[in-house]
A protein has these predicted regions:
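Internal, hydrophobic cores of structured domains that mediate oligomerization or house catalytic pockets
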Residues: 58-196
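C-terminal interaction module
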Residues: 1-95, 190-303
Length: 303
């Protein structure tokens, strides 16, 4: 796919040049074009308040300590393929219209096969990928995105949808990922991008810079408790007291950890810069204990 921008008198010669080059190379076929588009008006209005429920998955990496996110996607092709598989299931579940956001910042309506190909290519080339699904009748918007160095986020915004339904769908999506590739997963109104990139209330309680540059430790630490998360046995070894939480063993290394009452965590829609009830979050932090990568803990570990 080529992205060409400009006036007709500028664009047409380039198109003819591409056609000649393809012909000279023995390629046969037809060049087709499509205009760049933006999200439909109803979707822009629906997403204006920015209260999105998200599920984030951090993948195991094969890189050493001190990985620089600018180097691209850290986990490798198996995790990349898992991102695409999980992401496409998420986007197509409600049969909405698919939009690809290419690495060149141009958006196009595409079919599922093209969306899958573009996600794969963008993750391979830069590590950053984004696609969306829009269902006008359901007033439903879904996104799948990646965050360097090794995370993906599924997001959902549906008009008048009970929070329980969205949480159930996000939980099912998380548990559909191949757990042998997963370091950490969680559901909340903040996605991994917000945790790693934004200075939000409560971010002083964790070291996001150390976390971003050490994805090899994601299977040992989290930045903040969520109402629902998938943790590893390495996480649990650092916990203070999870007796007040519901825990479900998923495999030999992963455990689903959920608050016994999910309503305080999810019933009230929040923007990314808004936090749950302070008392609720403080108690969760005490329960999680050294699972949280605090600035002091990061300094002790030399991260």
């Amino acid at each position: 796919m080529l992205l060409i921008e400009g006036l007709d008198e500028q664009v047409d010669p380039w198109i003819h040049e591409v056609a000649r080059a393809l012909t000279d190379s023995g390629v046969e076929g037809t060049l087709t074009g499509a205009p760049a588009v933006g999200p439909p008006r109803w979707a822009q209005l629906l997403s204006r308040d920015a209260r999105w429920l998200t599920a984030s998955i951090g993948f195991r990496t094969s890189v050493g300590p001190g990985f620089k996110p600018s180097r691209g996607w850290a986990p490798g092709p198996a995790a990349r393929d898992a991102v695409v598989a999980v992401g496409m299931r998420w986007l197509t579940a409600h049969r909405g219209d698919l939009m690809a956001y290419t690495g060149q910042d141009a958006n196009f309506w595409v079919d599922a096969a093209t969306a899958s190909t573009l996600l794969t290519d963008d993750i391979t080339q830069s590590g950053n990928a984004l696609s969306g699904s829009y269902h006008r009748t359901r007033q439903d918007i879904r996104h799948i995105s990646t965050t360097l160095p090794s995370a993906m986020t599924l997001s959902s915004k549906t008009a008048d949808c009970p929070w329980q339904q969205t949480v159930d769908e996000l939980r099912a999506a998380l548990l559909g990922a191949p757990l042998d590739l997963v370091s950490i997963a969680m559901i909340g109104y903040r996605g991994m991008t917000t945790y790693l990139m934004a200075d939000v209330p409560g971010s002083g309680a964790y070291d996001r810079n150390a976390y971003e540059h050490h994805p090899e430790r994601w299977d040992e630490f989290v930045l903040e408790p969520s109402g629902i998360q998938v943790l590893t046995d390495r996480h649990l070894a650092h916990a203070h007291d999870l007796s007040g939480w519901s825990t479900t063993r998923l495999d030999g290394d992963h455990v689903l950890v959920e608050a016994r009452d999910l309503e305080p965590w999810y019933a009230t829609a929040r923007r990314p810069h808004e936090s749950p009830d302070p008392d609720l979050l403080d108690q969760a932090r005490r329960d999680f204990g050294d699972i949280i990568l605090t600035p002091r803990r990061a300094q002790q570990l030399g991260l």
